[in-house]
Amino acid sequence: MEEQQAKTPQEVIKNKGNVIKTRDDRELILIDLKGKVVNPEKCSWTPNNSETVNNSVFRSRIEPWLTSLFQSEHLSLLCGSGITTAISLLAYGKSGTTMEDITFSNYKDEIGAAVDASAKASGREKGNMEDQIRVANDLLRGLKVLGDENAVKLEEELHTIITNFATSLLSSEKEIAISSEDKRENAYRALINFLLSFASRTGNKERLNIFTTNYDRLIEVGAELAGIHLMDRFVGTIMPIFRSSRLNLDLHYNPPGIRGEPRYLEGVARITKLHGSLDWVQSGGEIRRIGLPFGAANINPYLEAPGLQGADALKLMIYPNSAKDRETAEYPYVELFRDLAASICRPNSTLVTYGYGFGDEHINRVLSDMLTIPSTHLVIISYDDPIGRILKFYSESAHKDQMSILIGANLGDITNLTKDYLPKSAIDRATIRMAELLQNRMGVASNIANPTIPAQIEPSTTNESATEEIINSES
């Protein structure tokens, strides 16, 4: 009965199956929980559907394709709440903080009606906490303009709600940090390998751009453990200040014995937190990043530092932020979204999304604009599609040939990804050199990228001197 019902992508995903589209696939390939292809007439790479599609088959199909895409001139990674959920489940068995609905005691009905209207206008069935905070902010500003005495009550309630939310984020970080050693190491190992698969680019290629909608600091912790140098718009050491101008700073080093020829340092990435961060605070006319430890018990003591000028939870730069006393209400988010557009809307650009549910219309519009450039490519990786926005974005797009889809309990599992499907989490010059040597010697393409296909190698006619010449040229 279950197999008969699973005929659409949504049903397959709901039943823990997988949806895949890579390489020359023209349509989505549906594979159920048992590994059977639901629509074999659409699948050209499983001629005999009597066999199940296992991880080895998936790997031979996915890993070479992603390895090729990751060599694009411009590579970007967009992470949503799914990455925090994945690491939290590995570390302590729970999904961590989610954007659950909150209840206002002041103007409850009015806020609820406005939230529902806003959600429907953006194509979502129901609103979330971000919608509720945004509507409450708008209402609060209106009440202050009118001089309504209820503005004080609403502001106090907003303060409590945001404080509780910040505390819940810190609690999720703490649960990861204090989980049992074996589970914590396993979770961190998966996170490190995941990030290194993207950041392991040679120094002469453009830096990886990491974008995230998350408020927590999980990606920063993973990068620190992996030895990845992150660069952002903040300048300073003790209490960095957000810089409005976008300077393309980079990291170089001087090789020993060589002067005047600096080389790009490997393992460097740029990070942009599109919705703000738990440790960003508005102080006066500036935005600062405070020294908030990962998993701290309470944020309030760190807001009482000298120089923050009475900052409280309402000054946290959590989108949509409550501290909108600037003439530009969208500051600094306009600059952050501009960085996203400038990074991905370029020829020969590849963007990989992981754990992003396509619930943000601002981001979706930028992704749609990116796909209007023929040489760009979008890879969507997700464990599921809970609000149906991923498949909706795909079905409505006119650029399906520029999209790869990996959705499901197998394909979206971060452990399976790092173990089987993502490229090596290292700069693998040895494999590249071996492939080039084989091609030069044998005159045929190497089958390293697809080990399931047996090599068809003719006897080499290359003499020893020619072989030595090839080796010398390679080295």
Kindly give the residue locations of the regions a language model identified.
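Short linear interaction motifs
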Residues: 50-69, 186-195, 199, 250-262
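A short acidic (Asp/Glu
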Residues: 86-92, 218-224, 283-285, 361-367, ...
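Acidic, metal/cofactor-coordinating or nucleic-acid-engaging core segments within structured domains
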Residues: 47, 284-287, 296-342, 346
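An N-terminal, globular interaction/scaffold subdomain
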Residues: 46-125, 130
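Extended, H/D-rich, highly charged conserved domains that either
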Residues: 95, 100, 116, 120-156, ...
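Short, conserved loop/helix-junction motifs that constitute active-site signature segments
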Residues: 195-203, 264-267, 369-375, 397
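Glycine-rich phosphate-binding "P-loop"
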Residues: 163-188, 316-333
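SIR2/sirtuin-family catalytic core signature
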Residues: 1-77, 261, 323-475
